[in-house]
From Swiss-Prot:
Gene3D superfamilies: Leucine-rich Repeat Variant
Chaperone keyword on record: no
Chief site of localization: nucleus
Protein name: Condensin-2 complex subunit G2
Assembly with partners or alone: Component of the condensin-2 complex, which contains the smc2 and smc4 heterodimer, and three non SMC subunits that probably regulate the complex: ncaph2, ncapd3 and ncapg2.
Spans of repeat HEAT: 460-498
Protein function: Regulatory subunit of the condensin-2 complex, a complex which establishes mitotic chromosome architecture and is involved in physical rigidity of the chromatid axis.
Region annotation Disordered: where it falls in the sequence: 587-611
Gene Ontology BP, a term: cell division
Cell location: Nucleus
Biased composition regions of type Acidic residues, renumbered to the chain: 589-601
Gene Ontology, cellular component aspect: condensin complex; nucleus
Top-level taxon of origin: Eukaryota
Amino acid sequence: MSKREAFLQATAKDSVEDFLSFIQLHKDVSDPFDLNELLQELSRKQKEELWEKLKTLLTEALVANPVERWQNIDDDSDDDMEVESSSDVKQTMCVIHGVTIAAAASLCVIDEDVCYETLLECAAILSGIVHALPKSESHITLAIRHLCEAWWEKGLQGKEEFGKTAFLLLLAKSLEVKCVVADIGRLWHLHQTLLSFDFNSEESHNVKDLLLQCFLSINHIKKEEGRRFLSFLFSWDVNFIKMIHGTIKNQLQCLPKSLMTHIADIYFRAWKKASGDVLQTIEQSCIQDFMHHGVHLPRNSPLHPKVREVLSYFHQQKLRQGVEEMLYNLYQPIIWRGLKARNSEVRSNAALLFVEAFPIRDPNLNHEDMDNEIQKQFEELFNLLEDPQPLVRSTGVLGVCKITAKYWEMIPPAILTDLLRKILGDLAADVSSADVRCSVFKCLPILLDNKLSHPLLENMLPALKFCLHDNSEKVRVAFVDMLLKIKAVRAAKFWKICPMEQILARLEVDSRPVSRRIVNLLFNSFFPVNQQEEVWCERCVALIQMNPAAARKFYQYAYEHTAPTNIAKLMLTIRRCLNACINRTVPNEDTEDEDDDEGDGEGIVRGDSEKENKSVLENVLSTEDSASMASLLEIVVVLWRSIRKALDQNEEAKTYTISKFASVLPEYFKAFKEERCTVPLIILASFMPPAAVPTFSCSVLSKLRHLDSGADEQKYSTLIDCLCRWGQVGHVLELASEWLSESYPEKRGRKDSNRQVRIQDTMESKPALALDYIEYIMTHTMNRDCLLSLQTKKLNQLLKVLGLVKEVLFCYIKPSEAVTHNVNQDTALRAFSLYCRLSIHLQHKFSSEGRTYLSVLEDTGGWIESQVLPTLESNQDISEEPRNMCHQILKAYLTVCKDVLMVGLADSEFQAQLLQITLSVIQTEKCHNCLPMLFYVLKEITELCLAHKMSDASVECDEMLDAIQKAFHKSLETVARRLRKQREEALQLLQTIQLPLGEFVHTVQCWHTASKVLHRGTLSTLLAAVVVEISHSLRKITDLSELTPPSSISDLPPLSKCIMTIIVKSPSAVSSFLDELTECITLEEVEGILSLTAALYVAVVSSKRKQIPPAVKNTASAIYRKLKNFCEVTMDDAGSIERAVYESSMRILNEMLHPS
């Protein structure tokens, strides 16, 4: 039996297994059986017989297992009945798959003589069941889709329905996450089938949803075939265009900006192929809508740049047929109106589009009308440059530069000159806006890209040279960027635009962003890396002579533009130059070492013969020119600093560089005695190990020892830095400790001196200088780190020595002739402050070891309570000097404690003790000078306490908060009492406490939810102070003419003015303050005509706005209700003060509550 006959018999209903075996053989690439070849061999009658059998096989399989049972195939079940049913369904799926493959293969053998009605029916059945197939049978869905595609492509009977089925399947597949590019290509291949769908029919609803999803699919938007397909969808129906545009607009914010060009391309393709109503709809409903939004969207809207991107794409297509005319027609009702709009942002947006689309013209206009249209648009450009809004003027500058750069040859010279004169003459010096000035220099590089503009700009730009000194940094940055552009395009010599002395003057003083750009501008001029090293040195000297400070700045950033190798070469070349200068001065002394001809370190420097330079430098430099010598040494320091990391990574090069400079450093110290030369030499020495410069390293400590007290910081700073870099900071501390110990009271000095062997030195001790050294070390981070890295024993010894100053301070508080010392008051106070500061640095360093050093500060607080405060509290008359000393000690201690609180080192125990000291200080009533610092401390403790309570509700802070409230209350009482007794001093005190008091109130207000008790207590204290003071001032009025209600806070008495100034800064504080005032009035805690009037004055000054806030009205209403109870006062004599106050208050209340 032949294969043909066997296959035909297998398609019978009783031979399903044989049929499936044939299908399996067909799918097996390695088997020679090919269904396509077999079908080619069949006669017309056999083909028809085969298709009949396939139809019968398919229908009987579907009848045996109808669609309703198919979903069970995906369900896992152990039920025997369901397992058997699932097995039957799987068999049916195999039959469907086999029939589909056979039907698809049959399409190749259909010709005009064959009747394929049966095959059509079979394909129709398959097409009908495709959507009911289980998800697990995706391979059958794919086979049916291929069948439908092939049917449609062959153009057989019923192709429209099969095409629609294939289209829907491909459309859904293309929207899947795992979609492949080929699916989108196939979808485009079937795009004509969309026209078979009736847009208004029910079946098209699902199609519409899927099609609209395509416009949100990145795969469709990015692929060429996808964009073709999407642009084709515009032609389906006019109403669908609006749906497409609405979908894109709604999702525009979610789409990345990078896709906007593709989105615009879709619109453009659709527009290009459209005609009639479709064209009109695309233009008016889509493109013109984008134009409208491009003009009216706020500039800060995330959609604005995306809409601009879409419109820019259309502007770029102006040379394409019909685009220019389309833009002219669509912009006509939008852009000209936008340019005249009242809203400056709308004008600016319209200007941006106008500039991009320029010229907006209809190519169909005649020559005369075209000229008029262009002239009108140039007039609009001039109008933009004269707009009152800086944003619009900036846009106008951008527009002029873009347009003139693009159309330079076509614009009349007179207009070009006028435009540039307007920009460079007026707007570059626009005093009202730095943004406009900045835009001028940012946009000029656009114009410089056109070489034709260079001659005119070369003549006009020198007038702008002083713009380099603009007070706005961004303008200066833009100006230098413009000079860089001029240099890059070779439009002119940049130093002719802006003279070199101006550029260097700016480099000397300007910020990093400007300086780095200037260095970039000047780099090739002063560091020509393509020339010999001697030339580099010559340029360096020339730069020094032009501007030494600018030279240092230049070489500070030079490393950014060249390799470390070149920097090192320049350092060594300068070294040779300095050596040559010294040799000419002292010809008999050879400052050169024998190693100068040796090889260099790997990759950094190369050896050069150390012979005297025979160059122009000999005629310029001399050791007598100390300024130039110092500048060269400073530049070596700057250069070395810039490549320290590179040298650290190349040990051989580092060693070579150190050896070169170490060999000549002693001669440099001999030759260059001036202080300005000595400083860089010391810094150079600090870059080397001390063993490399033994003579100098042994003399550093001696230099520090022999300095006079009161020496300037610059005399010892570099020496101390040097020792710190060498790890010898301990020597400085030993010297400082020695001087301090010798200056303290004699009994202590003798006791300490017995414990150590010391070289006899007849020099007197210098405690002030010792403190200068210690303070310098502690103030600078690098030095402080070196200090704290010492052994704990040495640090404790320093702390102990500094702590002995308390005995000196006690001597000033309670003078005694029995004790002598050599420390003045200022020095003692500095030592005390450094003692407290050092204890905190040590606590931070060794925090993991407990609170040892924090307890030191607590002990100091105990000393203040036991020794300092009793002196202030005593009723004995003490002189002004001890009292001032007590105040200064308190200030120094509280300042350090405030810093401890701020950096988070204070635990609850420390806070409690500090709060106790604060209360003690306030209760003395003689420490008003300390009140500003006390308020700062209260603020910090309050913030820590409330934050802790807020984060952990179980924390008990009530005692602490009560103490804070008590301290605050006492502080305000002290201020009020001071105002009554010594008003002039108190007024100065109010100025100093306003800032810390405001910070305290702000903290309490911000954390009011953490402690309502503290919040209310603070507000009631402030309120009582204000009401009492204003009432007191009203009570002192003797003449009715003096009764003037306050119109602002400045009209209030001093304390009230201070408090209300703080309150009105925060709307929430005003609201809380007035609520507290209203409650006090309601509870009759504020009563009487004068007190209620004082409360009214508070309400009046609390509102800055014309519209009276609800909180102010509530307070006014409460005052009105209580004040009415005193109406009998109107029966008093007309000259009565209380009556006048009452009537004045009622008038104010009537105006507030019943405005006309």
